């Protein structure tokens, strides 16, 4: 009730104020207002002075007179076409589906022999079977000698690395004086230490990493 009365009185005061201001003329301020200068628009800049473009001559097609020839012509040899004789014998040529004289076996033998199968004075002379057998036996004998030397070198290396292992008496089946083969638990124990990689068949172990 009290609030409504306050609101009504406020609205009445606002209405009276509007009526009092409506009848009064607009009061001008004393003094003159400063003059407003006109808007100045700058003139446009002059166009840029570009240099004249280079003279490009028109495209002309080179024309030669009817009977003109170059002073230094390049020599081009004429094209040679390989001509085959019409109806000539072709018995010396081997077709892909044919085999040479002697059958497929002879052809395979020539391929396997390589340059030895060539005929003529440039072909190497074939050795007789006896000489070939002797050469093969000599080659196999030299390979056995090299294999034995390698085995002896490995045995010497094993003695140098593990002198205690090779100092015990008793043969090991080709150990060369004192080498013995480790068996059972002793062999497993040695295999766990120093990498334990066997070097040959007599049971010698490598001493790398000790």
Swiss-Prot record:
Pfam families xrefs: ANP
Biased composition annotated in UniProt, kind: Gly residues: 169-179
Keyword Secreted: yes
Assigned protein family: In the N-terminal section; belongs to the bradykinin-potentiating peptide family. In the C-terminal section; belongs to the natriuretic peptide family.
Top-level taxon in the UniProt lineage: Eukaryota
Protein name as annotated: Bradykinin-potentiating and C-type natriuretic peptides
Amino acid composition bias (Pro residues), ranges on this chain: 32-56
Reported tissue expression: Expressed by the venom gland.
Function as written in the Swiss-Prot or TrEMBL entry: Bradykinin-potentiating peptide both inhibits the activity of the angiotensin-converting enzyme (ACE) and enhances the action of bradykinin by inhibiting the peptidases that inactivate it. It acts as an indirect hypotensive agent. Tg1 does not show bradykinin-potentiating effects.
Lineage: Eukaryota, Metazoa, Chordata, Craniata, Vertebrata
Keywords: Cleavage on pair of basic residues, Disulfide bond, Hypotensive agent, Metalloenzyme inhibitor, Metalloprotease inhibitor, Protease inhibitor, Pyrrolidone carboxylic acid, Secreted, Signal, Toxin, Vasoactive, Vasodilator
Propeptide position ranges: 24-26, 39-186
Disulfide bridge map: 194-210
Biased composition, class Basic and acidic residues, residue ranges: 142-152
InterPro entries: Natr_peptide, Natr_peptide_CS
GO molecular function: hormone activity; peptidase inhibitor activity; toxin activity
UniProt cross-references to PANTHER family, sorted A to Z: C-TYPE NATRIURETIC PEPTIDE
Positions of region (Disordered): 25-181
Pyrrolidone carboxylic acid, modified sites: 27
A cellular component annotation (GO) from this entry: extracellular region
GO biological process: cGMP biosynthetic process; receptor guanylyl cyclase signaling pathway; regulation of blood pressure; vasodilation
Signal peptide: 1-23
């Amino acid at each position: 009730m009290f609030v409504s009365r306050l609101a009504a009185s406020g609205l009445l005061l606002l209405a009276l104020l509007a009526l009092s201001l409506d009848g009064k003329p607009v009061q001008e301020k004393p003094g003159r207002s400063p003059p407003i200068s006109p808007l100045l628009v700058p003139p446009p800049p002059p166009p840029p002075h570009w240099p004249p473009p280079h003279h490009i001559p028109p495209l002309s097609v080179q024309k030669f007179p009817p009977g003109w020839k170059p002073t230094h012509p390049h020599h081009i040899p004429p094209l040679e076409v390989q001509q085959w004789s019409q109806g000539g014998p072709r018995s010396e040529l081997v077709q892909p589906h044919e085999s040479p004289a002697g059958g497929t076996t002879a052809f395979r033998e020539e391929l396997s022999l390589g340059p030895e199968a060539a005929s003529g004075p440039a072909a190497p002379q074939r050795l007789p079977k006896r000489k070939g057998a002797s050469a093969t036996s000599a080659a196999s004998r030299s390979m056995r000698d090299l294999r034995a030397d390698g085995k002896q070198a490995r045995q010497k290396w094993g003695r140098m690395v593990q002198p205690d292992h090779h100092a015990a008496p008793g043969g090991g089946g080709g150990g060369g004086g004192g080498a013995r083969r480790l068996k059972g638990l002793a062999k497993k124990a040695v295999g766990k230490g120093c990498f334990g990689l066997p070097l040959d068949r007599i049971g010698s172990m490598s001493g790398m990493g000790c």
